[in-house]
Amino acid sequence: MKIMLISGSHRMNSQSEKVAHYMAQSLLDNGQATATEVFSLAGNPLPLWDEGIWNGDAAWQALLNPLSEKLAASDGFVILSPEWHGQVPAGLKNFFLLWGSGELAHKPALIVSISSSDGGAYPVAELRMSSYKNNRICYLPEHLIIRNVESVLNADASKNNPETDRYFRERIVYAGGILSAYANALKGVRESGITHSDVFRFGM
């Protein structure tokens, strides 16, 4: 089972990417995935959506096809978003506009919101409300909000708040188990063919 983790921060060396790499290893260590991969939006690797995607523009195909194949080969996702000005970063919202060919469809995704303080609730609400309609990604009812992120999940234990760090590590294992179970279950749903329709290609 492959789980792909999308680090939604535009920043280089971001806390979102730190958490993504920690979670990727946790999924492997706990037998919740057989393969993981982190795709980072640091540095804005994906241009803003335009009609060239629909028209088969060669430049878009060269950029997106390799990533499309990786997404299509994944059984589930972890979507990590920092909270910027109470919002999901523009690059992460743009990411969801690019996949209309079933790469994400009917696959489970765990939302992980990242906050440097006690916030983090707004990205969860925003992603659940407005990022799934046409790509049909399936968000779990479980989510994580990693608060005071600079003080947890650091490789250098001296930088961690021991109690908070332990809590988040345990909660990540719990959420990873749920994601893994959903990935197994929804694979059968997709393979049944019930989700495929040439008529109803877009959500309502």
Please state what every model-predicted region is.
Residues 1-97, 160-173, 186-204:
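N-terminal beta1-alpha1-beta2 submodule of the flavodoxin-like/Rossmannoid cofactor-binding fold
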Residues 34-35, 106-108:
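Short acidic capping loops at alpha-helix termini that bridge into adjacent secondary structure
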Residues 37-48, 101, 134-158:
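Mobile beta-alpha loop/short-helix "lid" or hinge segments that flank ligand
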Residues 90, 103-104:
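Acidic/histidine-enriched, beta-strand-rich ligand/metal-binding domains
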Residues 94-102, 129-134:
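A glycine- and small-aliphatic-rich helix-loop capping segment at beta-alpha/alpha-beta transitions
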Residues 108-152, 167-170:
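Short, glycine-/small-residue-rich phosphate/pyrophosphate-handling segment
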